[in-house]
Amino acid sequence: AGKFLSREIMDLISTYALVSHPVDSKDLWPEQCLIWETAEPYLYIRTTRGNRIIVGGEDEKFSDPERRDALLRKKTLVLEKKFRRLFPSIPFKTEMAWCGTFSTTKDGLPFIGNCPDKDRMFFDLGYGGNGITFSMIGAQIICKKLQGIDDERGRIFGYERIEKYW
């Protein structure tokens, strides 16, 4: 997308996550709710249907895939340590870890709609950590736009705010 815009409007963030081997349900926390620690860097913990635990976070602002991948083992150990600090009684063993890159914007909202000066080019990007929600909203907005229907949410996520924040 950067090739079509007049300036950089997003930061690329490297992120890390792991999933445990299955854990006995009696060992899990009540309600198995999503846990989000808002420290910097943030930490999130949730369970899966098969009683596995997903731990993620340790984000860093850079986009070099080789550097990101080289940090995977170190970041996995940090995530494991943070989990064990919060839940020392839960038997926890990592089965798999992964990393990736996502983009975020200065105001935390994605850009959805036409590319400036290119009426037939649409973007839906910059979700931050909210890709499931924002990609669905983006698909709805763009689908309506292609049908000639105005979606008022498009004004919230439009490129017009570039001048305001960037």
Residue ranges, per PLM feature:
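C-terminal lid/capping helical subdomain adjacent to the catalytic/cofactor pocket in oxidative enzymes
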Residues: 116-166
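Active-site substrate-recognition segment that forms the wall
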Residues: 1-119
